Design a protein with these regions (language model features):
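Catalytic nucleophile loop
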Residues: 55
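Conserved G/P- and acidic residue-centered "switch" motifs that form tight phosphate/ATP-binding loops
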Residues: 52
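ATP/NTP-dependent adenylation/nucleotidyl-transfer catalytic domains that generate, transfer
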Residues: 2-45, 60-70, 77-80, 88-135, ...
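Catalytic-core regions of hydrolytic enzymes
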Residues: 138
């Protein structure tokens, strides 16, 4: 099975050469993490490991800092293949890096209690389903910060550039609630290149991206309506081109990107503050 995000040079969505100084990027991120931790007087990092490519890359680079790294596996009604990939990745890092330790915190009972307490019928209309799905992400954020504070560790984000700044494919105050974001300036395609350089397990490199927030399998592409390479292309032309400048799938993708990008601004802009006129304060 080919990697789902591989994009060929004949693709209409090709934006530039896929070559990258992967080793230099890895060293740069590791150094950035070390320097930030030192400035923050933190002992290291806590990372939620899902079995996906982003968390695998972040945790593998964090391991190379030499600082304490706590990897949390936090299943909530998780699919067996996601659990096995996460556990395999944690074991591999623990075997190589003495500064890495893993921990499993099964949040399914807590989540089930919450769902029962708020009386959500999970077959009800989509808004309730989405709210409950986002509750999974927020429960994991709470857990990461608990162990982060307990151990003097920075909660380390795993969002990529497309998710964090392109289409807002993250949960506000969920996986978007972090102290630092080491790979948020990298596209998904670039992260796959780094994963190959880091020798991330093939099972993770070949897994179809999913956010893991649903009982049924919902891929990222199905939820967003476009693949990561398509959205990377859209991000590169957004602001200089309009959907009407293109035809067919390119036009459709840029329309999707434009809609998602506009809708996600509340996730990245500062919290609005009601400014009181100066004369009212005298």
């Amino acid at each position: 099975m080919p990697r789902p995000l591989k994009i060929g040079y004949d693709s209409p969505f090709q934006i530039r050469s896929l070559t990258m100084q992967t080793q230099a990027v890895i060293r740069h991120i590791a150094d950035w993490l070390k320097n930030y931790a030192a400035a923050a007087h933190a002992k290291g990092f806590v990372v939620g490991v899902s079995g996906g490519i982003d968390s695998a890359v972040v945790s593998a680079i964090a391991a190379r800092t030499g600082l304490k790294v706590l990897l949390l596996e936090m299943p909530i009604r998780q699919k067996a293949d996601q659990v096995s990939r996460a556990q395999e990745h944690i074991r591999r890092l623990e075997q190589v890096f003495p500064n890495v330790s893993g921990m499993r915190v099964d949040l399914t009972p807590t989540f089930d209690t919450f769902a029962a307490d708020v009386e959500v019928d999970e077959t009800e209309f989509p808004a309730k389903q989405l709210a409950l799905a986002n509750a999974r992400s927020r429960l994991r954020m709470l857990t990461l910060y608990y162990y982060g504070q307990l151990n003097g560790l920075l909660v380390t984000g795993t969002g990529n550039k497309i998710e964090d700044f392109g289409v807002g494919f993250f949960t506000k105050y969920g996986d978007g609630g972090v102290d630092i974001s080491p790979i948020a300036d990298l596209t998904k395609t670039q992260i796959y290149q780094i994963a190959a350089e880091l020798d991330i397990a093939e099972s993770i490199q070949r897994a179809v991206p999913t956010d893991g927030l649903w009982d049924t399998e919902r891929t990222d592409e199905e939820q967003m309506g476009a693949s990561y390479p398509e959205l990377e292309w859209a991000m590169s032309v957004y602001g200089t081109h309009r959907p009407e400048d293109f035809e067919g799938r390119q036009r459709e993708v840029l329309e999707i990107y434009t809609r998602l990008h506009k809708a996600m601004q509340h996730k990245v802009n500062p919290i609005p503050v009601c400014k009181i006129p100066e004369e009212m304060l005298k």
